[in-house]
Curated annotation (Swiss-Prot):
GO molecular function per UniProt: NADH dehydrogenase (ubiquinone) activity; quinone binding
Primary location group: membrane
Transmembrane segments: 2-22, 26-46, 51-71, 90-110, 144-164
Entry EC no(s): 7.1.1.-
Subcellular location field: Cell inner membrane
Similarity comment: Belongs to the complex I subunit 6 family.
Organism: Paracoccus denitrificans
Protein name: NADH-quinone oxidoreductase chain 10
Function (record text): NDH-1 shuttles electrons from NADH, via FMN and iron-sulfur (Fe-S) centers, to quinones in the respiratory chain. The immediate electron acceptor for the enzyme in this species is believed to be ubiquinone. Couples the redox reaction to proton translocation (for every two electrons transferred, four hydrogen ions are translocated across the cytoplasmic membrane), and thus conserves the redox energy in a proton gradient.
Keyword Methyltransferase appears in the UniProt entry: no
Catalytic activity: a quinone + NADH + 5 H(+)(in) = a quinol + NAD(+) + 4 H(+)(out)
Length: 200
């Protein structure tokens, strides 16, 4: 039963990932992406990593994929023109693909890491430790520096996205709150003697 479930989730994830790449409709591609995430979460459950599976569903399916779906549906993007512009980057994509395939071939071949690399490998967590506790011990004890660096990279990416999307238009009227707070009421207020039946 476990073998059948593994092949079911694995084939579903591979097919969904392939459909994401070749899909012509971006909305359909996002839906296939959600299926790929759910299949990967099922594989994590089979491996006994329920916490990681739940994180995958909540973060990727519940936030990222839904955000992609709303962006694709709400933005008026000419995908035909976009594909035409992306065609010029096809040679670079092929080079990167060949490099990745070569790296995968080296990783799955008879290559063995050096003794120094083996000494840096973390010792396995005790089997008696629960899944969530073991993950916390690995992240916050053995790889705490890498974890903090990953958070710093995400922070820089968030700040960069805000800076890139922030636009200042000169024709838009804005309030200077600090200037309004420090202004002198005697200079900003003016009393007028309005006569009856007349305006200013």
């Amino acid at each position: 039963m476990m073998t059948f479930a593994f092949y079911l989730f694995a084939i579903s994830a591979c097919v969904a990932g392939f459909m994401v790449v070749i899909g012509r409709n971006p909305v359909h591609s996002v839906l296939w992406l959600i299926l790929a995430f759910l299949s990967a979460a099922g594989l994590f459950v089979l491996q006994g990593a329920e916490f990681v599976a739940m994180l995958l569903v909540v973060v990727y399916v519940g936030a990222v994929a839904v955000l992609f779906l709303f962006v694709v549906m709400m933005l008026d993007v000419d995908f035909a023109e976009l594909k035409g512009e992306l065609a010029r980057y096809l040679p670079l994509a092929l080079v990167i693909g060949v490099v990745l395939l070569a790296q995968l071939g080296i990783a799955f071949s008879g290559w063995t890491p050096s003794d120094q690399a083996e000494s840096l490998r973390a010792a396995p967590v005790d089997a008696a430790v629960e899944n969530t506790l073991g993950l916390g011990l690995v992240l916050y004890d053995r790889y705490v520096l890498m974890f903090q660096l990953a958070g710093l990279v995400l922070l820089v990416a968030m700040i960069g996205a805000i800076v890139l999307t922030m636009r200042h238009r000169k024709d838009v009227k804005r309030q200077n709150v600090l200037e309004q707070m420090w202004r002198d009421p005697a200079k900003t207020m003016e009393l007028k003697d309005v006569k009856p039946g007349q305006g200013l």
